[in-house]
Every structure is written in C-alpha cells, then in structure tokens.
Amino acid sequence: MKPFLLTLLCLSGWVAAGYYAWNSKAKNPEPPTHGVVIQPAAPPFQAVFEKWAEKPELEAALTALVLLDEEGRVVFSSALGETALCPASTLKTLTTGAAFGMLGPEFRFETKLIHRTDGNLALVGGGDPTLSLADLEQLAATAVAAGLKEVSGDLVADSSVFSAPPVNDHWNWGDIGNAYGAGAYGVNVGHNRMLVSFRPGARTGDPAEFLKADPDPPQTRWLNTVTTGEPGSGDGVTLYSTPGGRVISTVGTVPRGPAFSVRGALPDPPAVATAALRAALERAGVKFAGKPGLGVGELAVHRSAPLAEIIDHLHEVSDNLEAQCVFLTIGKVSGADPATAVRGYWEKAGVGFVGLRLLDGSGLARANMIRPLDLARVNLAARRGPHGGRYFQSLNPSLGGNVRAKLGGMSGVKTDTGFLTLENGRIYTFALMANGVGTGFDFWGLRDELLAAVRHAAE
C-alpha cells in the first residue's frame, strides 16, 4: 500500500473515533464541574428530599435544601439550592451572626439623660430596642438623686443615632401599623407597641367601639371602622399609621363578646417616651420652665442587657424591632450603610454571595433574597467565627435538641436554617427554604419529618 493511502486510512480512523467519542459524550454528558460539588453521600439525601417535596401540600411551592458538612463541603444541594429565594426571618441570622463578630456578646445599648447647654433636658437614644417604661422611671429617679430639681428649658428626645428612616421602604403598608412591623428609632419604648382595646357590638356586623390605647400616643386622632365579627373569630384588625404621624386608622373585625384587645405599633415612640419620662420627673418634683437656660451635663445612663441576651430573645420570638435595631447599630458602629457592613463582614468570612438582596435586618421585607447555599454558608461561618459557640447556643432547639435553628415565616414563605447534629456527633449546617407555600397544613411538622429523615439517612 502506498504511503499516501496508508496515511489517508489512518486519518479516517481518527476522525471516526473522534466522532463516536463526541457523540457518546453528547448523549451522556459529564457532570459540570462548576458551582456546587455534590459529595458521594448525595443519593440518599436526594431520595429523602424528593419524597418530601412531592407531598401534596408542597406540590405548588418552590422548595430547596442545602446541607454542608463541618468542613463546609456541600453534602447535598437540591435543584434550587443556588436559586435566590425569599428568606423571611431566617435573614435575621445574617444580622445576629455579624453582630456577634462586629459588636461582641457584651455590647450594651446606652440611653442617656443629658441637661444640655441650651437648657433643655435631652433623652438621648442609643437605639435600644428593649428600653421600657420602667427603665424611664429609673432614669428619672437617678437624675433626681443626682440633684435635678428644675429644667430651665424643655424635655426633648434625640433619636439621631440612626440616620435611616425608622420604617424601611420595602415593608408592606399593612405591616407597619401592626406590632410586628414597628419602626426602629433612636429612642424606642416598650418595643414600640401599644395595646388597643375595642368593645364589640351586640350583633355580627355592628360597629365595634374604640375604647383606649395603652400606652396612649399623645395628640393622636383615631379613625375607627372596626366591626363585630363572629364569636371566636379572633384578631382581624389592621392598623395603619405613618412614622411620627398623629392619625391612626383601624379596620377589620373583633369577635363578638367581651372587650377585645389587639397589639399595634406606636407611630411616634420618642413622643411616648418623653411624655412618660416627663410625668415621672414631675411626680418627683422636677419643674420645667420652658425657657432658654444653662445645663449641667449628663445626669443618668441606662444600659441594656448584654447583646447576647438580646439575641437569645430575638431568635426565640423572631423580634423584628430588635433585629432591625441591631442591624442599624452595626451600620452606625462601622460607619457604613448597614447592608454594606453586614454583607462585607460575611464576604470577609468567605461567603461569596450571588443574587443577595439585603434590604433590612429582620427579613420583614418580601423583596429580600438569598440563595439557600449562601444562607447555610453564613450560618457555618457564624459557628466558626468569633463567639461561634454562643451563636449556636442562641438558636432555638428542637427534635430533642438535635436541631438548633432559626425559623422564618410570612404569608406564602416558610424557611429554616441552622444545625443538625447526627447520631455520630457530626454536625451538618442546613438551609431549608419554601416559597409559594399554601395554607391549611402544619409546615413545621413536615419540616421536623424531613430533618429526622435526613438525620437517619446520614448514618
């Protein structure tokens, strides 16, 4: 055979071999090497998650689960593990984990009573979300004990510690007048909540009479259209107000029967705080002249409980005000926008966010978005970071103590993130997110069922 023909045959063979190899890969492509790397343990978790996600209650929802081992390797990620979803209150873990690292567990909020050089007595807020009416009474007593007898000027509130508006632009209008949507001010009091009482009518559909609010917002006009609902129908009231406003609208229903109370947000907490403080001072004999004059400086300071204890409570009841005040304080201390400061903290800890929308510190904004993968990585970084053991302890226990986690929930959204302890003592970090969830079933019971099954499959 001539050399030319031999060469041609060899080339033909190579081309044919290359075509069949390409065709085989096209039909059976190799798994991608970018993104999340699934460890060999994924198959049992895949089956567990798919069986769970196929339940009729979840068939219309977007569901995702991510599991990380103690080294941060991805043990399992469901199909939506790298898709940004609404986190609800699990977003609080970005705030609280960063707070442990940036502020420290012993950080305390300070509220001061200062007699200024213009003669005014100033209640200077430090953003303490836990300041109470009893704390204001104690501030008054301390100031009187320090010799305060007369104020040449007036009593004023200084809330300038936070530059951000007290109510986030992304919070729902229907949330901000209700207790869980209370704004975050430099001067807060009683968690910025009031108890609003109504007297139902004799028949369903009758107007319900507005009785009182406690504490009573000063100089406030109430526009009440609440009516009487069926007996046992519960709290159907929504309150509408604006920060610093003097008009509160109440709509909805209260159940027929005895007087019924609902919780609402104070529209002007600094005004309520100064009114209460002035009353306490006047009861102690302090006179207010209301004229320019001289002051004597700082008279009293109230310090909050340590931050770690506030975070314990914040996680336990998912307190939006406490989370937002901590978030804004991180920004104040760092000298940056709070979202930038919190994000930067986690990025320095090795969390590479994709698709993150961090609009508040509490998760109340529905426009917040985070990938389940990133939510899990934040929690692992928090456990590994400064005071990680204290952070772990602050999360709510369940499943016989084998789970430590922060839950999140709002209409259509259920989420969960934290740590799952296996029978061999290893600890997985997890993030479970469900968006588009319906009503009429116990999601948290299903959540417990899933985590118990994951724990069993890990052995």
Residue ranges, per PLM feature:
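Short beta-strand scaffold segments in enzyme catalytic cores
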Residues: 65-67, 111-114, 417
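Residue-level preference for non-acidic, small/hydrophobic
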Residues: 72-73, 92-99, 155, 187, ...
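Hydrophobic membrane-insertion alpha-helices, especially the h-region
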Residues: 6-18
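Small-residue-rich helix-loop
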Residues: 75-78, 302, 317, 324-459
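A short, well-structured edge-of-sheet supersecondary motif
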Residues: 54-79
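Positively charged n-region of N-terminal signal peptides that target proteins for export
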Residues: 1-4
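Conserved serine DD-peptidase/penicillin-binding transpeptidase domain
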Residues: 18-54, 101-353
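Short active-site loop at a secondary-structure junction
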Residues: 78-98, 102, 311
